[in-house]
C-alpha cells in the first residue's frame, strides 16, 4: 500500500491557499481499517508570508487614516484581531475529509484542518504590524517610547538584509556551505533558499541555538563542531555584524532619548526580542507525526528547521539588552 502526500493537492481549494499563505500549521489525519496516524506540517516560508503582509500594508495605506499615536495603536489591535478572526472562520469552513481508494486494495480516510489558534495569532501579528507601520508617523517617535516598535523592526530589517547580502555574495563565489549545512538539494533555487536561510542565521547571530538542515548551530558547535573553517568564519563574522549594529543602535538610543527618565534599553530589548521571536516562529519548517502502516513516498520522518520560540525570546532579549547597554553607555564617553 502506498500513499503520497502529493495526492492531497486534489482536495485543495482557494480557502486552503489563503490559509497556507498565512503560514498556518496543517494537521493531517489518516486511517484505514487496520491503523491510523497523524502528521503536522508547518511550512514557514517567509517569501510566502510576504503576500498577506503586502496586501495588508496596501489596504492600510488606502483605508486607514490616523490623527494621533493612540488611535494608531487601537486601529492596529483592531485590524489584527479582525484579520485573525477572519482566518479562524475560513479555517472552520475549510476543514476537509475525503476517502481515497485504489481499486479493491485499500480504503483510506483522510482529513485535514489548520491549527485555529496559530492562524489567529498569525493573523493578529500580520494585521497589527502592517497597520502600525503605515500609521506610525515620525513625528510621534519621541512622544511615546512605549510604542517604539518601528525602531526595533528597522534594526532587524537592516540585519536581515545585511545577512542576506552576505550569504548571496558568498554563494556567488562558492555555495559549498549550503552542502555543509545539508541544503544541497535546494542549491538550484539559491535566492529562495537564501531568503529563508537568512532568517535562521539572523536568529543564530543573536546567540540563539538554531537547527539548519542536518546541523544544530550554537556557539559551542562553532568552537567544537565539525564545520569547515570558512563556514565558521562566515558565522562568526555575522555574529560580529549583529554586535556592531546593536551597539550603534544603543548609542543612537542614548542620543535620541537622553532626557528620558524611562529605561529605553529595556523597552527596546523587549520589542526587539518579540520581533525576532515572531520572525523565528514564522520561518520554522516542521513536519512531524506518526504514520504507521502507510508507505508515504513524500514523508521521510520528523523534520525541523529553525529555533524554539521560548528559547529565542529569552536569549535574544538577554543578548540584545547587554549589547544595547554597551552602546548606550559608550555615548557617555563623548
Range-by-range predicted roles:
Residues 50-60, 64-65, 72, 79-93:
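Small-residue-rich
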Residues 71-74, 94-125, 130-158:
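Membrane-interface helix-loop-helix junctions at boundaries between adjacent transmembrane segments
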Residues 1-53, 93-116, 168-238, 278-321, ...:
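Long, glycine/tryptophan/cysteine-rich extracytoplasmic
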Residues 150-151, 155-164, 223-242:
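Surface-exposed interaction/gating patches
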Residues 1, 67-81, 145-163, 258-270:
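Alpha-helical transmembrane segments and their helix-start/interface "positive-inside/aromatic belt" motifs
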Residues 80-90, 160, 164-165, 271-279:
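Aromatic-anchored segments of alpha-helical transmembrane domains
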Residues 237-244, 262-275:
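C-terminal substrate/ligand-recognition segments
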Residues 38-68, 122-142, 230-258, 317-334:
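Transmembrane alpha-helical segments in integral membrane proteins
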Amino acid at each position: 500500500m502506498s500513499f503520497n502526500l502529493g495526492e492531497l493537492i486534489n482536495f485543495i481549494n482557494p480557502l486552503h491557499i489563503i490559509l497556507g499563505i498565512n503560514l498556518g500549521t496543517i494537521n493531517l489525519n489518516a486511517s484505514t481499517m487496520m491503523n491510523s496516524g497523524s502528521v503536522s506540517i508547518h511550512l514557514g516560508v517567509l517569501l510566502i508570508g510576504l503576500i498577506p503582509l503586502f496586501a495588508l500594508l496596501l489596504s492600510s495605506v488606502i483605508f486607514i487614516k490616523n490623527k494621533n499615536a493612540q488611535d494608531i495603536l487601537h486601529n492596529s489591535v483592531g485590524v489584527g484581531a479582525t484579520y485573525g478572526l477572519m482566518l479562524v472562520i475560513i479555517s472552520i469552513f475549510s476543514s476537509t475529509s475525503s476517502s481515497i481508494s485504489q481499486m479493491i486494495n485499500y480504503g483510506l480516510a483522510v482529513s485535514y484542518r489548520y491549527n485555529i489558534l496559530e492562524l489567529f495569532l498569525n493573523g493578529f501579528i500580520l494585521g497589527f504590524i502592517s497597520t502600525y507601520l503605515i500609521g506610525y508617523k515620525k513625528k510621534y517617535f519621541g512622544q511615546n517610547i512605549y510604542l517604539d516598535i518601528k525602531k526595533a523592526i528597522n534594526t532587524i530589517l537592516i540585519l536581515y538584509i545585511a545577512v542576506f547580502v552576505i550569504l548571496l555574495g558568498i554563494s556567488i563565489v562558492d555555495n559549498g556551505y549550503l552542502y555543509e549545512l545539508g541544503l544541497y538539494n535546494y542549491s538550484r533555487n539559491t535566492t529562495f533558499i537564501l531568503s529563508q536561510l537568512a532568517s535562521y542565521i539572523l536568529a543564530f547571530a543573536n546567540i540563539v541555538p538554531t537547527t539548519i538542515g542536518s546541523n544544530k548551530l550554537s556557539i559551542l558547535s562553532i568552537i567544537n563542531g565539525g564545520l569547515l573553517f570558512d563556514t565558521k568564519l562566515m558565522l562568526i563574522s555575522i555574529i560580529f555584524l549583529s554586535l556592531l549594529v546593536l551597539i550603534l543602535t544603543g548609542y543612537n538610543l542614548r542620543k535620541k532619548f537622553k532626557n528620558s527618565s524611562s529605561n529605553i534599553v529595556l523597552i527596546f530589548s523587549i520589542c526587539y526580542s518579540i520581533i525576532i521571536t515572531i520572525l523565528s516562529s514564522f520561518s520554522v519548517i516542521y513536519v512531524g507525526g506518526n504514520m504507521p502502516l502507510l508507505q508515504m513516498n513524500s514523508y521521510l520522518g520528523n523534520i525541523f528547521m529553525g529555533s524554539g520560540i521560548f528559547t529565542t525570546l529569552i536569549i535574544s532579549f538577554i543578548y540584545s539588552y547587554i549589547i544595547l547597554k554597551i552602546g548606550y553607555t559608550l555615548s557617555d564617553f563623548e
